[in-house]
Amino acid sequence: MKFSLWSNYGALNSREVFDAFASGAKSLGYDVVWNDPNGDVDVIWSVLWSGRMAKNKAIWDRNLAQSKPTVVLEVGGIKRGTTWKVGLNGINRDAYFGDMGNNSDRATLLSLELKPWNTNGTYVLIAGQHERSEQWRNQPRMSKWVLDMIQSVQAHSDRPIIFRPHPRCPLPAIEREFKNVIRQTPRQLPGSYDDFDMDFNDIYCTIS
């Protein structure tokens, strides 16, 4: 089997991850080529069709039409920049990540601890997505979704709302017509490639 790694269309922090994938594939006896349309399995970075990754969309669409597998590499959801996702045919819930029956060894290795369900908190957090991501396919414009969510929350709750836009899909000032809605602009953490201060302090629930 031949893996084609599309590093030309990866984010600036992706090269070491592509290299690690290539090393692992070769150690298992597979062939690896770079940016070659003739591979058996394409390996791309993210399903955000924007910026450097925009040209991955043609690879993704072609593979869907041909029932050809696509491995998606992406920054990890836990300890970003330290852990990384490797999914088959998507990311998050759309992807296959291998066997599900895992024990707690990996969580222990990452010093993760499951906390009790939060029943307190002041704010309802609405977390925006990037509307050019494959995750947002067949959905309304992000601005419409956010406004609809604010109206829906305010119809059922008097809790104040925090709107936290995606760092690269900021939707300036769309919440101004509403009372009791606060914009929280993510700030990049010093020394990181794309980590932001996305904490959940005093959050009652999150809508995303």
Functional labels for PLM-detected ranges:
Residues 1-47, 132-133:
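N-terminal pre-catalytic "stem/leader" segment of glycosyltransferase-like enzymes
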Residues 7-10, 147-191:
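Catalytic donor nucleotide-activated moiety binding site of glycosyltransferases and closely related
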Residues 10-11, 48-50, 76-79, 129-133, ...:
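Short, solvent-exposed loop/turn segments at secondary-structure junctions
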Residues 14-21, 52-58, 140-152:
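Well-ordered, non-membrane alpha-helical segments in soluble/globular domains
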Residues 16-25, 54-64, 173-180:
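Short, aromatic/basic amphipathic alpha-helical patches
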Residues 34-64, 201-207:
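Short, well-ordered secondary-structure micro-motifs within conserved domains or adaptor modules
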Residues 68-139:
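A nucleotide-sugar donor-handling region in carbohydrate enzymes
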